[in-house]
Swiss-Prot record:
Record's keyword terms, sorted: Hydrolase, Protease, Thiol protease, Ubl conjugation pathway
Pfam family, one: Peptidase_C65
PROSITE patterns according to UniProt: OTU
EC number(s) recorded for this UniProt protein: 3.4.19.12
Biological source species: Mus musculus (Mouse)
Site, Required to orient and stabilize the active site H-224: residue positions: N226
Lineage: Eukaryota, Metazoa, Chordata, Craniata, Vertebrata
MF GO annotations: cysteine-type deubiquitinase activity
Hydrolase keyword on record: yes
Domain of life where this protein originates: Eukaryota
Protein's UniProt name: Ubiquitin thioesterase OTUB2
InterPro entries assigned: OTU_dom (IPR003323), Otubain (IPR016615), Papain-like_cys_pep_sf (IPR038765), Peptidase_C65_otubain (IPR019400), Peptidase_C65_otubain_sub1 (IPR042468), Peptidase_C65_otubain_sub2 (IPR042467)
GO biological process: protein deubiquitination; protein K11-linked deubiquitination; protein K48-linked deubiquitination; protein K63-linked deubiquitination; proteolysis
Reaction(s) catalysed (UniProt annotation): Thiol-dependent hydrolysis of ester, thioester, amide, peptide and isopeptide bonds formed by the C-terminal Gly of ubiquitin (a 76-residue protein attached to proteins as an intracellular targeting signal)
């Protein structure tokens, strides 16, 4: 499936279908074959610099479908996020529209357990981008509110405010471990990132936060994130 054949998030397809992305690359072929022993399917995301936020948002909400107790717990957390944004210095009128977009899709998941309805929202450019912008602002707020911790992980020449203003909040800015750590903690979402590179080494992955049981799995390759689906354990 080429990136031009879908809008923002693709339909689910077999993990081995991505072997044809690089048919001549022996290392890539081996690593995807290894990955297929633990993951059955993949959804591709558009490579627009927002792929991490969009992939995490969609994948976690999809994992909540049909789980009323977990949805309620997540709603309670989401309802607290405006306080986090206010504490970080954001004015309510500047984030309310983005918060409403995200909260609306959480309510949709609560009322409608269909994958197609959720996918439709995330493939609508306007709705999807508002959701991404909210997740970016929340990530920024979490970092700003814990500046003493996060300042150890960013460039010494850039303070926390500048980092958030230039590297986190703007659309299309790619993310790194700092943003992943912040957003996963801000929403209490455990995720596992599988790394596929062109080094002739073993596959490796990272769990955020460490030792947590992931509910979201992402594939990272050449600065891009796609959504993975783990094989059922028997």
């Amino acid at each position: 499936m080429s990136e031009t054949s879908f809008n923002l998030i693709s339909e689910k397809c077999d993990i081995l279908s991505i072997l044809r992305d690089h048919p001549e690359n022996r290392i890539y072929q081996r690593k995807i074959q290894e990955l297929s022993k633990r993951f059955t399917s993949i959804r591709k995301t558009k490579g627009d610099g927002n792929c991490f936020y969009r992939a995490l948002g969609y994948s976690y909400l999809e994992s909540l479908l049909g789980k009323s107790r977990e949805i309620l717990k997540f709603k309670e957390r989401v309802l607290q996020t405006p306080n986090d944004l206010l504490a970080a210095g954001f004015e309510e009128h500047k984030f309310r529209n983005f918060f409403n977009a995200f909260y609306s899709v959480v309510e949709l998941v609560e009322k409608d357990s269909s994958v197609s309805s959720l996918l439709k929202v995330f493939n609508d450019q306007s709705s999807s981008d508002r959701i991404v912008q909210f997740l970016r602002l929340l990530t920024s707020a979490f970092i700003r509110n814990r500046a003493d911790f996060f300042r150890h992980f960013i460039d010494e020449e850039m303070d926390i405010k500048d980092f958030c203003t230039h590297e986190v909040e703007p659309m299309a800015m790619e993310c790194d471990h700092v943003q992943i750590t912040a957003l996963s903690q801000a929403l209490n979402i455990a995720l596992q990132v599988e790394y596929v590179d062109e080094m002739d080494t073993a596959l490796n992955h990272h769990v955020f936060p460490e030792a947590a049981i992931p509910s979201v799995y992402l594939l990272y390759k050449t600065s891009h994130y796609n959504i993975l689906y783990a094989a059922e354990k028997h």
